[in-house]
């Protein structure tokens, strides 16, 4: 028994003692340093790192054993049989082990820091490693493990590390034997670090970034720091500091021309003076190449000369005020979970650049080190964020406590001295690894973790480690005092426009302001982006914002019988707690198909804007580019159009200095235009770039140049025959027969040439399938906008030879409640069609009426829609920048925006007319003013009822909604209430619709 006890006490399992110890964060790891991969002398160090002879990538299938609980882990688990395999990198939940969980704020475990549940799930990874002694060390590198890792080589315990998104390096040389070796990594789902990693994401586990072994000489370069200091007239200084050994170095431009050669001794800083330096910015991502020779190793470093500072409350890069047109990004992919390959990361960043995004916040943890190299090359500013978020503290006493300095609320761990070292460690992991990346302009302490001594200490540590960048943190925007001394910018989330404007009026505050999260892009949104843009550009102290967020998060649930991916979200995985589809809040779908919200971002972030000049034919081109002449990179053509199509096409040359304007003349005589006429300027890429091809459409602007005449219905005189019975009114005019039900006060039939055009009665429509931003939807259901009874107070018919008029008074409501709407309507039927004029008075109990209009269920063969209005994609009063006014046509089946959680979609704003047609019949809709419409194969009831898009069932009819008005979509899912100017006016609405039926 004593032998067994001794074996257990010295077993691999016995070494697992650090994951609840906030002072034991990294055991047996090497010191933190800047990211680099050495190459062998004679190799090109700027090639793909996988080509380095000094790097051995261990990605691939590893042996795997999963344990539901650490209690089940054998004492000598490293010698158990590994029958299963799993890809590395990956997350084990994607391979049938354990299950994903989506939680936003709430912790996935009981709040009892630093302790975690006894039943911690464990994934044990194992693989062989061949070793031939050659005098060099073998350094095993993990770039990302969630949540912590215990490492063993052969029978020996090597070490432990936490911080999921930080690099951990172990010198495994002392534990290796010549020939075959066994590497075992035991990964725990939770550790004390879990309390600091409560990010809003689907919770997954495992080795999720690259694993590799570096072969390094005993005496080697351990670390180096590159600083660039800009001078005057194109001069600059390069400050280079090395640690570990002496080096020689050569700096070349991107053509390979040598700019400088120098040497540096271990621990020495060398300063190199340069002239005619090309500067790095998001618009001009010029990189020099620094080749570092250290013994028989060679290291390649790309250097961007740039500086970032605050000048009189303005963020400036290279001396120029900048605006961040940014987005927040998580590592999230439906097939690979947290693992982001080089190709996936590059595709994300290319897509951002193609949509005029110039900045990214790594919410809320450091990304792969390769990600930053891509940002350097493509040109994106980065807020680099520490792996820190503890907003789950707001829930631990059963209520939301968002007082950022309250120990009993969100700031609990920010004030807990047990976590002080852990919080500083996360900052050190961040800064030391990424310190040489020019794309990084802000260091961020983390996200939503309150404020206390630990955060102050973290900020001061970052300042000591790097004085060349700005320090950012959102959770102190409402505090004064110590935050002023360490935070260079004030940061906020989801402020409304008045809050932004009010910031400038604070006499005690003179720092820049950034919205590190704004315009929540969940579902059909964001809808107020243009307004924020206008405020950001109203004052230089506003340095822009970062839309939340880049992608919808999802773990697929399989495929439908038709092969369609079933994207899952919170609640689909059988979790104890979940936050539903709140993770579906991106500008792109999980597969990176753009939402219409991304198209909106592209247009709002456009580099050139056009307004009318003072004289006819003159237009003012204004650039929002800060470093580049827009005329050097963009071509411009224009189209003059009216409701009949394109009238004229031309091209213009232009020249605009950065942040400047110029006047362009386009000869045109507006007196010649009978119809409402528009000019649209289209700006395209002048040449190929790293992210787009020559001719790619970068942006556009459209202006009305002639008012023209409104769409009027031609008067047609035909004989009208009206017959009234106690229950019904029948009106016949030409080939059209209308039947009006007096009890329901509704048209129950419209026949043309004997063919029925209505599958259901024509209805008034007050409801829409709630968008994710429609947080007031519970009021809509309470008032029963979606499900109501109709009361008719009277129906009168007056008829003449060429006209029939039906006047009704009615109300809409539900049992128990007072009517939510009282309506008077006059229906006029004549040879030109059906004319509807109504006056609707609404109850003040309705919280933000979503729409008012009419709805028709038409036969399926009425499948083609043509309209003159905002298109070609969905558009709303506050979400239409990506659209332009024109004549568009589409099959109704193609007019559905397929949000993963079904909701209102594909409305079209600002329409002058709409026709819905079959092969031989056309139904034309107009209104007294511009209107919105929606044509869909799905009813709003179906969209509202189903939780996933793959559950939707098409209606037996095509559903046509013609709206006097549709409320905006906003971003209220996690942002301010919809602005009043985008709401429907109440309590009284006067609306006018006209329906005309004709033969094609």
Where are each of the predicted segments found?
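Extended substrate-binding grooves/exosites of carbohydrate-active enzymes
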Residues: 2-50, 88, 103, 156, ...
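Glycine/proline-rich low-complexity spacer/linker segments in large multi-domain proteins
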Residues: 2-37, 45-49, 158-159, 182-215, ...
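Accessory beta-strand-rich segments of carbohydrate-active enzymes
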Residues: 5-14, 30, 48-49, 63-69, ...
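Beta-strand/loop-rich accessory regions of lumenal/periplasmic or secreted enzymes
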Residues: 86, 94-98, 103, 144, ...
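An acidic-aromatic loop/edge-strand motif
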Residues: 94-101, 106-115, 172, 176-246, ...
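Beta-strand-rich binding/interaction modules
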Residues: 151-153, 234-262, 270, 618-652, ...
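Extended acidic/polar, glycine-enriched regions
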Residues: 177-180, 241, 246-309, 672-673, ...
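Catalytic cores of secreted or luminal carbohydrate-active enzymes
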Residues: 199-220, 562-620, 624-632, 639-643, ...
């Amino acid at each position: 028994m004593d032998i067994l006890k001794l074996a257990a006490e010295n077993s691999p399992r016995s070494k697992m003692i650090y994951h609840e110890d906030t002072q034991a964060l990294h055991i047996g790891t090497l010191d933190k340093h800047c990211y680099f991969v050495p190459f062998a002398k004679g190799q090109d160090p700027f090639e793909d790192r996988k080509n380095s002879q000094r790097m051995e990538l261990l990605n691939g299938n590893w042996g795997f054993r999963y344990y539901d609980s650490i209690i089940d882990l054998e004492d000598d688990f490293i010698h158990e049989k590994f029958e299963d395999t799993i890809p590395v990198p990956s997350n084990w939940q994607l391979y049938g082990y354990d299950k994903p969980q989506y939680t936003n704020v709430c912790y996935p475990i009981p709040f009892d820091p630093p302790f975690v549940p006894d039943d911690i799930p464990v994934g044990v990874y194992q693989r062989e490693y061949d070793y031939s002694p050659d005098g060099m060390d073998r350094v095993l590198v993990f770039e990302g493990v969630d949540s912590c890792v215990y490492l063993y080589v052969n029978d020996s315990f090597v070490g432990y590390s936490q911080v999921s998104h930080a690099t951990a390096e172990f010198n495994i040389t002392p534990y290796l034997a010549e020939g075959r070796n066994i590497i075992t990594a035991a990964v725990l789902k939770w550790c004390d670090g879990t309390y600091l990693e409560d990010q809003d994401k689907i919770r997954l586990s495992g080795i999720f970034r690259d694993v590799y072994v570096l072969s390094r000489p005993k005496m080697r370069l351990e670390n180096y720091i590159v600083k660039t200091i800009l001078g005057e007239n194109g001069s600059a200084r390069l400050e280079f500091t090395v640690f570990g050994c002496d080096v020689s170095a050569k700096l070349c431009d991107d053509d390979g021309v040598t700019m400088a050669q120098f040497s540096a001794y271990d621990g020495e800083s060398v300063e190199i003076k340069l002239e005619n330096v090309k500067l790095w910015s998001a618009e001009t991502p010029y990189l020099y190449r620094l080749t570092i020779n250290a013994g028989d190793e060679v290291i390649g470093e790309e250097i961007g000369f740039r500086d970032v500072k605050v000048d009189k409350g303005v963020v400036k890069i290279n001396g120029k005020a900048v605006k961040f047109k940014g987005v927040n990004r998580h590592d999230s992919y439906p097939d690979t979970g947290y693992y982001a390959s080089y190709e996936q990361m590059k595709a994300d960043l290319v897509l951002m650049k193609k949509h005029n995004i110039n900045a990214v916040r790594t919410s809320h943890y450091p990304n792969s080190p390769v990600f930053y190299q891509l940002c350097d090359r493509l040109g994106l500013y980065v807020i680099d964020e520490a792996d820190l978020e503890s907003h789950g503290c707001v829930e631990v006493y059963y209520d939301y406590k968002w007082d950022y300095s309250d120990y009993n609320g969100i700031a609990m761990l920010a004030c807990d001295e047990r976590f002080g070292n852990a919080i500083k460690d996360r900052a050190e992991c961040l800064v030391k690894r990424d310190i040489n990346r020019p794309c990084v302009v802000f260091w961020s302490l983390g996200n939503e973790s309150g404020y206390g001594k630990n955060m102050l200490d973290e900020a001061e540590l970052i300042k000591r480690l790097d004085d060349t960048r700005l320090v950012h943190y959102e959770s102190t925007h409402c505090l004064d005092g110590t935050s002023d001394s360490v935070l260079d910018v004030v940061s906020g989330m989801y402020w409304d426009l008045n809050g932004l404007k009010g910031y400038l009026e604070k006499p005690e505050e003179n720092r820049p302001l950034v919205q590190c999260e704004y315009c929540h892009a969940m579902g059909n949104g964001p809808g107020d982006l243009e307004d924020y843009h206008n405020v950001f550009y109203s004052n230089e102290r506003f340095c822009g914002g970062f839309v939340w967020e880049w992608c919808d998060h999802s773990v697929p649930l399989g495929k439908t019988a038709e092969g369609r991916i079933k994207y899952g979200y919170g609640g689909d995985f059988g979790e104890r707690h979940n936050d539903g589809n709140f993770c579906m809040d991106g500008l792109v779908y999980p597969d990176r198909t753009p939402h219409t919200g991304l198209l909106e971002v592209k247009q709002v972030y456009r580099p050139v804007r056009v307004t009318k000049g003072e004289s006819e034919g003159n237009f003012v081109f204004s650039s929002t580019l800060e470093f580049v002449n827009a005329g050097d990179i963009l071509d411009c053509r224009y189209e003059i159009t009216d409701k009949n199509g394109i009238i004229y096409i031309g091209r213009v040359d232009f020249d605009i200095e950065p942040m400047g304007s110029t006047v362009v003349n386009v000869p045109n005589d507006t007196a010649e235009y009978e119809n409402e006429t528009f000019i649209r300027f289209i700006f395209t890429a002048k040449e190929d770039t790293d992210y787009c091809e020559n001719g790619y459409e970068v942006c556009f602007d459209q202006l009305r140049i002639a008012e023209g005449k409104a769409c009027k219905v031609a008067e047609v005189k035909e004989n009208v025959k009206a017959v009234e019975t106690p229950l019904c009114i029948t009106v016949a005019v030409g080939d059209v027969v209308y039947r009006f039900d007096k009890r329901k006060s509704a048209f129950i039939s419209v026949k043309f040439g004997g063919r029925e055009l209505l599958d259901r009665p024509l209805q008034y429509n007050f409801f829409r399938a709630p968008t994710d931003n429609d947080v007031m939807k519970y009021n809509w259901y309470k008032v029963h906008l979606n499900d109501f009874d109709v009361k008719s107070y009277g129906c009168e018919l007056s008829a003449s030879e060429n006209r029939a008029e039906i006047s009704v008074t009615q109300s809409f409501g539900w049992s128990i409640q007072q009517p939510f709407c009282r309506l008077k309507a006059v229906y006029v039927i004549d040879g030109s069609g059906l004319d509807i004029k109504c006056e609707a008075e609404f109850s003040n109990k309705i919280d933000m009426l979503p729409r008012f209009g009419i709805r028709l269920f038409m036969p399926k063969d009425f499948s083609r829609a043509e309209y003159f209005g905002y298109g070609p994609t969905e558009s709303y009063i506050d979400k239409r920048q990506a659209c332009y006014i024109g004549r568009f046509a589409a099959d109704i089946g193609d007019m559905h925006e397929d949000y993963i959680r079904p909701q209102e979609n594909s409305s079209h704003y600002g329409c002058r007319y709409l026709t819905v047609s079959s092969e031989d019949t056309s139904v034309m809709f107009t209104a007294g003013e511009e209107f919105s419409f929606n044509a869909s194969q799905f009813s709003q009831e179906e969209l509202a009822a189903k939780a996933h898009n793959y559950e939707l069932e098409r209606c037996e009819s095509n559903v046509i909604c013609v709206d006097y008005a549709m409320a905006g979509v906003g971003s209220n899912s996690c942002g301010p209430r919809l602005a009043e100017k985008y709401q429907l006016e109440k309590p009284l609405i006067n609306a006018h619709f006209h329906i005309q039926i004709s033969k094609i």
